[in-house]
A protein has these predicted regions:
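Short alpha-helix C-terminal cap/hinge motif
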Residues: 117-129
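Detector for C-terminal structural segments
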Residues: 31-62, 109-119, 142-254
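Short, well-ordered beta-strand elements
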Residues: 96-106, 129-132
């Protein structure tokens, strides 16, 4: 399985009073069986996301993958999901909420992904899901940009091989922060990351930044897009990257 570097996730609109409740967001994340989605539905080499920074993207000064050094922030627990939703509804003073799930029908595999999410979320008592099918362009440049959504089924691909290509999306002023997430602690930490000269200190700060984002669940990571391929066992030296040119054949030998 080869990572394509893309993270597929759910963007909650935190200007929605129901989604501003952390327990509601926790319920949504816990209701998703990521392993089942990847292995039994997508079946394309994708793997369950463990955090907001995908695996294979960036290596630490000590030579370790960011994902291996950071914590795992995702899990599937239907009972805990229901308990979190029950607590959230209690805090909101409601017995039931309805959320719109927006996705692009012209984005593969968004339709399959969205349907899976609909079933997972709707299985929770007290939560109804309304599907909003549209185009990728309308989803991003109209609905997300104007805040006309509750939950958006979306993805992000790395612009460069550093965790900040994902972590900057948590900054309150970031143009891709469509959910209007604001955390002054994260903003200050990301400012340190941008100006830090010591590589090891910067690495630790980025791990801490992801923890803040995942504790707040400003984004709900679901899976890392992959491609299932076959490679001759005798072929050595093929370099595969999730960013930029995917294959380098310069060092291939047999």
């Amino acid at each position: 399985n080869i990572s394509e570097g893309f993270l597929f996730y759910v963007q909650p609109n935190l200007e929605n009073a129901d989604l501003a409740n952390l327990n509601v967001r926790k319920a949504l994340s816990l209701a998703i069986n990521r392993k089942d989605l990847c292995e039994n539905v997508l079946k394309d080499g994708s793997q369950a996301a463990k955090g907001f920074v995908p695996s294979g993207l960036s290596i630490s000064p000590e030579g370790k993958d960011f994902r291996d050094e950071a914590a795992t922030y995702t899990s599937y627990d239907k009972k805990a999901a229901q308990a979190a939703l029950d607590e959230g509804l209690k805090e909101l003073g409601k017995s039931e909420i309805t959320l719109r799930l927006t996705y692009g029908t012209d984005e593969s595999p968004m339709d399959v992904f969205a349907t899976y999410l609909q079933n997972a979320f709707s299985s929770l008592k007290g939560l109804k899901i309304e599907m909003v099918a549209t185009t990728k362009q309308d989803r991003i440049y109209n609905k997300q940009k104007n805040g006309d959504f509750d939950l958006s089924v979306t993805r992000w691909g790395p612009d460069y091989g550093d965790p900040t290509t994902y972590l900057t999306m948590g900054i309150s002023t970031n143009g891709n922060n469509y959910g209007k997430y604001t955390n002054s602690e994260l903003d200050a930490l990301m400012d340190k990351v941008a100006n830090e000269s010591d590589a090891n200190t910067r690495w630790k700060e980025m791990i801490d930044a992801e923890k803040i984002m995942m504790d707040d669940l400003c984004y709900i990571p679901v899976f890392e897009k992959g491609t299932a391929t076959l490679q001759n066992k005798d072929v050595k030296g093929l370099v595969i990257r999730p960013v930029g040119v995917p294959y380098t054949f310069q060092y291939v030998s047999k």
